Amino acid sequence: MADGPDEYDTETGCVPLLHPEEIKPQSHYNHGYGEPLGRKTHVDDYSTWDIVKATQYGIYERCRELVEAGYDVRQPDKENVTLLHWAAINNRIDLVKYYISKGAIVDQLGGDLNSTPLHWATRQGHLSMVVQLMKYGADPSLIDGEGCSCIHLAAQFGHTSIVAYLIAKGQDVDMMDQNGMTPLMWAAYRTHSVDPTRLLLTFNVSVNLGDKYHKNTALHWAVLAGNTTVISLLLEAGGNVDAQNVKGESALDLAKQRKNVWMINHLQEARQAKGYDNPSFLRKLKADKEFRQKVMLGTPFLVIWLVGFIADLNIDSWLIKGLMYGGVWATVQFLSKSFFDHSMHSALPLGIYLATKFWMYVTWFFWFWNDLSFLSIHLPFLANSVALFYNFGKSWKSDPGIIKATEEQKKKTIVELAETGSLDLSIFCSTCLIRKPVRSKHCGVCNRCIAKFDHHCPWVGNCVGAGNHRYFMGYLFFLLFMICWMIYGCVSYWGLHCETTYTKDGFWTYITQIATCSPWMFWMFLNSVFHFMWVAVLLMCQMYQITCLGITTNERMNARRYKHFKVTTTSIESPFNHGCVRNIIDFFEFRCCGLFRPVIVDWTRQYTIEYDQISGSGYQLV
């Protein structure tokens, strides 16, 4: 073996050696045809065609004529390729059935790479042909002349549906080829997209296995290929940044050799996330996921309090206060670099919401309690708060409509979809390994498929879907009233405790006076106004979509992607829109002592837009 990095491009056999442009090689597999040959659409004289050409073009009658005249279907041509190979690579299912009925050997080896027809079909990505050949007993575990089985070829060429089908039919997700390469390693090296790597990871593939010769992990191979998409997936799945190959090189070392700044930064961040580059006492805390989560949730509590507390201090020197604010900023920077991880995008907004409401309630009970009427103000405020806490808790912790399936159900679904010609990534989720119901979507934040997906809300730390959308609407409604009461409390406090001259000196003088009178109260007021704006806008948008359009936020944003929506430049026509009144009754499931009969849908199992579904799997009148 060579000593330098270039050895990875000079190894023989089924070791990564092809350049990216050779992934679809113009080789013996397609016999010079750039794409699988289509059927002839014009009248032609097929009577002079030999059986190989007729097979390539799918001329069934000519092929049958020659076979009936005595041609041996097992006989290879001058290039050692059988008719079954040519039918397989050009996806001629009817001819495959015919040739096998006439005695063709389904696993006969042929061609320069000594491959089976199943290998040829796999390389070209013909899932329907793979299914058909395996129905006739083709063995996907057989290796070709390069030492690869079908799952390795499918992973190399990015045929995700075929990878899924082969695994569902029993192929080992960690199967090694003759050179010790797993499907994950091939996908990491050859396929610069999320799939099939994401699919393999979902099947609990061994992320940190090393290949037979170089001892490179999938992360090593992704770095060698500059596959940034897959690098991110592997790191999220627990890829070991410090794993070393036979030369003692880590993935980070290889990235530095290639001087790829993006890869170097991300691999170093992965090390830091595990606490490897921190002092020992910080490393232990950094490695504690629960502690990191508490820090991310708790930081907003500290920051909101310190901002108001420093402003409220009876200190005339703004220099001192400025230095104190600088200390707050430095503390936040330290915490963020030491303990914040990729989950901060969901943890921080939730922490900000919880912290804001906590300090608002502290302000209400310690500043407003003695100034406001109990019956007319405090009692309604407390009742509203109970409803707010209930709906927030349900929005935060309840199941938003996660589509669940057992391992066996997932594999069964894959096989059923493949064998019916429906294993399309537009209706199949390669992460959750389920058939996606209508109106569902895979949430990239939660990494789950959600029924009737609306959006992922960072303010409640959860997706909003079929299971909690009504609670989310209740949360917005009662939150808006809570904020209005808070603003009312601030204004009342200023009227009772602050000397103001609004009518005499105008608005800006009034702002200065109330900010000086109680900086803490002014800080709470600013928070209230900020939250009022986004809550009011979100509530109005949600109500408009629910009542007038009959669609979710996801559907409104991506309507052009869904065939069942009719989209113009000015409107979206939804098959789920039944008029404002009907939409409201169905969404909130209003019954009013039997006056209304809402239509209840199990969106986790609804795969079509038709409404005449039986109870438990579709629309149901109550």
Swiss-Prot record:
One Pfam entry name: Ank_2
SMART domains, per database record: ANK (SM00248)
Segments traversing the membrane: 295-315, 316-336, 348-368, 372-392, 471-491, 507-526, 530-552
GO biological process assignments: axonogenesis; lipoprotein transport; protein palmitoylation; regulation of ERK1 and ERK2 cascade; regulation of modification of synapse structure, modulating synaptic transmission; regulation of neurotrophin TRK receptor signaling pathway; regulation of programmed cell death
Bilayer topology: Multi-pass membrane protein
Top-level enzyme category: transferase
Reactions mediated catalytically: L-cysteinyl-[protein] + hexadecanoyl-CoA = S-hexadecanoyl-L-cysteinyl-[protein] + CoA; L-cysteinyl-[protein] + tetradecanoyl-CoA = S-tetradecanoyl-L-cysteinyl-[protein] + CoA; L-cysteinyl-[protein] + octadecanoyl-CoA = S-octadecanoyl-L-cysteinyl-[protein] + CoA
Residues in ANK repeats: 41-76, 79-108, 113-142, 146-175, 179-209, 214-243, 247-276
Compartments in which it is found: Golgi apparatus membrane; Cytoplasmic vesicle membrane; Presynaptic cell membrane
A GO CC term attached to the entry: glutamatergic synapse
Ranges of the Cytoplasmic topological domain: 1-294, 369-371, 492-506, 553-622
EC number, UniProt record: 2.3.1.225, 2.3.1.-
Span list, region Necessary and sufficient for interaction with DNAJC5 and SNAP25: 1-295
Main subcellular localisation: Golgi
Family: Belongs to the DHHC palmitoyltransferase family. AKR/ZDHHC17 subfamily.
Subunit (UniProt): Interacts (via ANK repeats) with numerous proteins (via the consensus sequence motif [VIAP]-[VIT]-x-x-Q-P). Interacts (via ANK repeats) with CLIP3. Interacts (via ANK repeats) with HTT. Interacts (via ANK repeats) with DNAJC5 (via C-terminus). Interacts (via ANK repeats) with MAP6. Interacts (via ANK repeats) with SNAP23. Interacts (via ANK repeats) with SNAP25. Interacts (via ANK repeats) with EVL. Interacts with SPRED1 and SPRED3. Interacts with GPM6A and OPTN. May interact (via ANK repeats) with SPRED2. May interact with NTRK1; may regulate its localization and function.
Name of the featured protein: Palmitoyltransferase ZDHHC17
Originating species: Rattus norvegicus
Protein's gene: Zdhhc17
